[in-house]
Amino acid sequence: MKLCLTFLLVLMILASVTGEKLSEQTLRRAARKNKGPRCWVGRVHCTYHKDCCPSVCCFKGRCKPQSWGCWSGPT
């Protein structure tokens, strides 16, 4: 029984010394930062609808919400 508890204690100490928890936090932070390209409505100059995010379209050279009435020109 004492040997088992000692073994568990050693494993816990090794996990804290090797920075296992730190690396998990680092991976979580990196995953939060890497969300892919961001699209800005109204700021992006566009020529075609595909130049904008899926939820917006190209309207008069700018990416605008689809509620503005996207024209059915080049996609």
UniProtKB/Swiss-Prot annotation:
Propeptide: 20-34
GO molecular function, one term: toxin activity
Tissue: Expressed by the venom duct.
Cleavable signal peptide: 1-19
Disulfide bonds: C39-C53, C46-C58, C52-C63, C57-C70
Keywords: Cleavage on pair of basic residues, Disulfide bond, Ion channel impairing toxin, Neurotoxin, Secreted, Signal, Toxin, Voltage-gated sodium channel impairing toxin
Domain of life: Eukaryota
Coarse class of the protein's main subcellular location: secreted
Record-level GO cellular component terms: extracellular region
Protein's UniProt keywords contain Signal: yes
Subcellular location(s) of the protein: Secreted
Family: Belongs to the conotoxin I1 superfamily.
Entry's free-text remark on domains: The cysteine framework is XI (C-C-CC-CC-C-C).
Role summary: Iota-conotoxins bind to voltage-gated sodium channels (Nav) and act as agonists by shifting the voltage-dependence of activation to more hyperpolarized levels. Produces general excitatory symptoms.
Name of protein: Iota-conotoxin-like R11.3
Organism in which the protein naturally occurs: Conus radiatus
